[in-house]
Amino acid sequence: MREVQKSLPPETLCAQQAADMAQINALAKREMTPEEVYTFSVRLCDNEIDRDGERFDAQTLRELAALFIGKSGIFDHCWSARGQTARIYRAEVCREEGRTTAAGDGYCYVKAMAYMPRTEGNQELIEEIEAGIKKEVSVGCSVREAVCSVCGAARGECEHVHGKRYDGRLCYTELRGAEDAYEWSFVAVPAQREAGVMKRFSPQTRRTLKAFLRTEGHKEALTELD
């Protein structure tokens, strides 16, 4: 997860570090130094069809990349301030040349850079990230619509079945129009094989923050919003 670019010349590394610190300090309450922070990369989500038979389109990924800047990293989607462990300071959509999705288009994903302070309390987590133990992530977000790839109807309003082909067209649900990004979490088993996306919205419910909280059972957070 952590990227080490040993091949870059020193002047490039210095410029990159300066740019990173400028973005980190835009989020921090006081100016941090490179020695005080640990940075690592995460693959948040992609445009591959996931275990739920759903996927984001490329445009929605670009929208999510912008929305996730500044969002907290937590554990298992447990919405508690005590669980905040890292924060995203940069995100972009990347493509893997030569790779296609099950839907037949070019594969792309949201790559994010996150930071956390190098404190005694974070040392164990940093070591787990470096060792590849804490690796899989899942995101909590909302989208404007979820439609059938075959007919374009809203999810649940047609008879097409995920995984089946109709006149050669694979059926899956396409998630379009990012509305909000809530958080990203370290999890054991993400919905997406490469990253992980948590999506438990009914097709009839507008995908708002309160709807997400009700679906996930976060009563305390709902009380704070109300």
Can you describe what each PLM-predicted range is?
Residues M1-K219, E224:
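Signature of dsDNA virion morphogenesis modules
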